Design a protein with these regions (language model features):
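Helix-coil-helix junctions within alpha-helical repeat/solenoid scaffolds
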Residues: 12-174
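Internal metal/ion-chelating core segments
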Residues: 1-17
Length: 174
């Protein structure tokens, strides 16, 4: 729902102004008020929660719903941009088994030759491994994986504002 995405952008402005209560209100009442399974709505929510938590903001139990919705999506790989966010939700939701399933599936997909699998081989698997390393507190490993891949992240799609999340992970890992 593109309306929800516009509200997500509005929340980014509030985030930059450090109005965290406002961000959470927009999350709950606007761009995640309807808990859809549509990938754009999910990626908006996942990216915002990740940004908030990395600023030390308690997001309560909001990860649970997103991890629940991400868990059955460890195999499809229709759009790597979404996969990168799903693995974030799985990590923050503590879904260790699903993370391993997704990493295994991504490794297998990287061997195939369709467009999304080429993206996975070029940057996606590295990005997923870096996200997991970061979440586990292995910041040096996350940094070492992300640094050489930083200019290839554009291949996953999304806007500059959406892909900026991965630059933030790199910066925070450093």
């Amino acid at each position: 729902n593109f309306t929800f995405h516009v509200w997500w952008h509005r929340a980014l402005f509030s985030l930059e102004k450090e109005r965290y209560d406002e961000v959470l209100t927009l999350y709950d009442t606007q761009f995640r008020a309807t808990q859809t399974e549509e990938y754009l709505d999910m990626t908006n929510a996942i990216a915002m929660l990740w940004r908030l938590e990395n600023r030390g903001i308690d997001v309560g139990n909001r990860w649970e719903e997103l991890a629940d919705l991400s868990e059955p999506r460890t195999q499809g790989h229709l759009l790597y941009f979404a996969d990168a966010h799903f693995i974030m939700a799985l990590a923050r939701g503590g879904r260790t088994e699903a993370i391993q399933e997704m990493l295994t599936s991504l490794r297998q997909a990287a061997q195939r030759d369709d467009t999304q699998c080429q993206v996975i081989a070029r940057v996606g698997l590295t990005l997923a491994e870096a996200i997991v390393s970061f979440h586990e507190g292995h910041f040096d490993a996350a940094f070492e994986r992300l640094l050489p891949a930083r200019y290839d992240v554009i291949a996953i799609g999304g806007s500059h504002a959406q892909r900026d999340l991965f630059s933030l992970v790199l910066t925070e890992a450093a």
